[in-house]
């Protein structure tokens, strides 16, 4: 693409001089010259054709001088537009003033065309650099916009409302969850859904990695898990089938840890399977805390055709569960110390409120602990109370 140069000078001979000297570059399409005879005419041309690259302007002109034109050009706020000022030899005051106003360079009359050519080439290098930076900034802005859209889409995937149950069992539980991605989008997710008239299914999961790849794998995993879970009565069999599907077309180093529980709201009977996930905290009605016993299984998508185990426990009214991802326990403070499971269980033991109160207590303590340390992993919590 031709370098577009606007020459602004009230001397008519300069137009002939420039077109003659640069005729080869003009013929090759490297340079494209336009001419104005004063600042007013030049400014009008700039406003009508804002794609000029270089302004070659005399300082002393009628109607609008070069310094005034330079000030008006600065108002256009185009960092890719470079101004080369032309002044009489020895007119250092005007040259200094032009440079202070942001001129790229200057040359003196009589014009040394060889020197002017080198100055134009230097300006062209700067223009190419600025335009490349502008393009990269535009691409970054586009990517950020797409990530914002992806974030909104991911947020719509996560459930917002509790599943509907008859009044006879609806009052037996409360549940709250939250997810805070380390980047625009994350690989953690949670889910909860009605299986039948008395059973509630709930899931927390953590995909390996972060960012867009993890978010895509998260959406796939969540869809497969939920689809199978709604028609499969067994936690273990649900994870086995999901693992089989994820392993068929697995991407290298992509897997997902999952805790899946099914709670009978009428009896408090809890069945669960754990595919390599952090064991949830069980908070008994009297404040005692313990970690649910792991089932010893590995993450989904890592190894095909393996069985998964299922364990059971019973909740009584007043008992609560806190499910979490390792972004909680592995969060670090400014000294490099991990938040850890012990701090988490201590918070659970001291918080006696609703699931939302429990989540608030954990996130508040986490924020106080990490301080100014940037979040390095997705943080997800799901709290459930049985009443």
What is the predicted role of each segment?
Residues 12-34:
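Two-component/phosphorelay signaling modules centered on CheY-like receiver
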Residues 19, 35-54:
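Acidic, metal-coordinating helix/loop segments flanking the phosphotransfer/catalytic sites
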Residues 38-41, 65-71, 90:
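Acidic catalytic/metal-coordinating carboxylates
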Residues 44-45, 67-79, 97:
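Short amphipathic alpha-helix used as the core "switch/output" element in two-component signaling
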Residues 135-320, 371-387:
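… and, occasionally, acidic/histidine-rich disordered N-termini of signaling adaptors
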Residues 311-323, 328-387:
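C-terminal catalytic subdomain
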């Amino acid at each position: 693409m031709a370098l577009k140069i606007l020459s602004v000078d009230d001397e008519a001979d300069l137009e002939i001089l420039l077109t003659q000297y640069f005729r080869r570059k003009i013929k090759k399409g490297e340079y494209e010259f336009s001419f104005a005879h004063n600042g007013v005419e030049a400014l009008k041309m700039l406003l009508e054709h804002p794609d000029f690259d270089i302004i070659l302007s005399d300082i002393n002109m009628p109607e609008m001088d070069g310094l005034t034109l330079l000030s008006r050009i600065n108002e256009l706020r185009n960092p890719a537009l470079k101004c080369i000022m032309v002044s009489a030899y020895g007119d250092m005051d005007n040259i200094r003033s032009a440079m202070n106003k942001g001129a790229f360079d200057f040359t003196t009359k009589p014009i040394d065309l060889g020197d002017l050519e080198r100055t134009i080439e230097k300006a062209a290098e700067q223009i190419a650099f600025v335009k490349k930076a502008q393009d990269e900034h535009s691409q970054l802005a586009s990517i950020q916009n797409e990530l914002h859209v992806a974030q909104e889409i991911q947020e719509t995937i996560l459930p917002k409302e509790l599943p509907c149950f008859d009044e006879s069992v609806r009052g037996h539980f409360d549940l709250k969850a939250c997810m805070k991605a380390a980047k625009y989008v994350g690989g953690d997710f949670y889910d909860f859904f009605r299986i039948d008239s008395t059973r509630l299914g709930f899931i927390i999961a953590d995909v390996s990695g972060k960012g867009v790849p993890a978010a895509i794998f998260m959406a796939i995993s969540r869809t497969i898990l939920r689809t199978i879970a709604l028609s499969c009565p067994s936690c273990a069999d649900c994870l086995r089938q999901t693992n089989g599907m994820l392993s068929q077309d697995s991407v290298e180093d992509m897997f997902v840890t999952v805790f899946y529980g099914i709670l009978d709201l009428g009896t408090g009977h809890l069945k669960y399977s754990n595919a390599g996930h952090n064991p949830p905290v069980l908070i008994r009605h009297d404040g005692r805390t313990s970690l649910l016993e792991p089932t010893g299984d590995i993450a989904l998508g890592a190894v095909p055709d393996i069985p998964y185990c299922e364990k059971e426990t019973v909740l009584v009214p007043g008992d609560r569960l806190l499910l979490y991802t390792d972004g909680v326990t592995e969060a670090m403070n400014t000294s490099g110390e991990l938040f850890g499971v012990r701090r988490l269980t201590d918070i659970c033991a001291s918080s006696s409120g609703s699931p939302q109160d429990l989540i608030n207590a954990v996130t508040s303590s986490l924020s106080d602990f990490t301080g100014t340390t940037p979040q390095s992993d997705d943080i997800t919590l799901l709290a459930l109370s049985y009443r």
